Amino acid sequence: MKHIVIIGAGYAGMAATARLARRVKGRDDVRVTLVNPQARFTERLRLHQAASGQRLAELQIPDMLAGTDVEFVQGWVTGLDADARTVRLDDERVIGYDTLVYALGSVADTEAVPGVDEFAYTLNSAHDAGLLAQELDRLGAGTVVVAGGGLTGIESAAEIAERHPELDVVLLSRQTPGSMMGPKARARLHAGLARLGVRIRSGVDIVKVMPDGVALADGEVVPAGAVLWATGVRVSPLAAAAGLRVDERGRIITDAALRSVSHRDVYVVGDAAAVRQGYGLVHGTCQSGIPTGVHAAANIVRELKGKQPKRFRFGYVHQPVSLGRHDAVIQFTHPDDSASRFYLAGRWAVAYKETVSASPWTTYRLLKLLPALGAVTWRRGGGFTR
């Protein structure tokens, strides 16, 4: 009997699981096991909302898997033996596999700058976001530093400022927030942040995080009652330790079909994968993660049928950014994620962003119910492909 094991139930891992669940249901020659530390699904697209004190729905992975033949195992993966084809859990259980889907994702890089791990908050989980929310309520007034001008930093700063108008929210960034957008969308983004009272300071480097603020490279100290670290991510060292070929950031290098180039029985999806397209490497987002999960699952099904796996091709569509609950900016993009001349802002953008944030769970349900959905087309290089 073939045993397919998926480690990690983020956006990409859940997509692979849901796709496989429908395709192998009722088969007595295939087992599918999903391993994840928590039974609760982490909506990373909404963690900035949780950080500001909003309650999120508690989506349960076992509920999603109900009615399928997928086995859910709760536990932390602490070791991988790629040659023996086994994964080890924190309770010393060992699970063997014939095919592995590696979907361990990424977390905030708290090791690159001194003090981050000790004194900064992160958005790695709903629990982490809840800790920051409690601290913001405790502060009452004061300054909150959000480090990082990417999508997570922008959305977090906006959400905190809207929910806590008594706080002075400072967004510190090496680059201009919204630098990936076109000039009109970027100007609209900055106007939205200014309306909420967010102070932007770009072109700065944080060299140390302290209990009461952050130190910049030029010697300035920015006082803060709380610091949210939203710049830079790192992947699990498990892959490198197991001997899988990885790039300089520790991501597993894949072939065109999303298999590890060093271990063809390992498919890699989401943030943990170094997937190359014609325009360069795919960067880790939910937008690209779900397609990698669906495609890897489809290729596994093809291999079960004795067919060759297909090449993965993908192009980006948009950069959706919420600015609190009442404003948003959507930058539409070319397939390589560069900004097009089209963007959306205001209430229609709010509705668009909410649809994007809510779509993964619905997508998993549809993948579980409708086999044909796994053959959806992903945008690529000005065209579409299966």
Pin down the residues of each PLM region:
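Beta1-alpha1 glycine-rich phosphate/pyrophosphate-binding loop at the start
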Residues: M1-E71, E155-P183, L228
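FAD-binding core/adjacent interface of flavoenzyme oxidoreductases
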Residues: M1-H3, D69-T143, L228
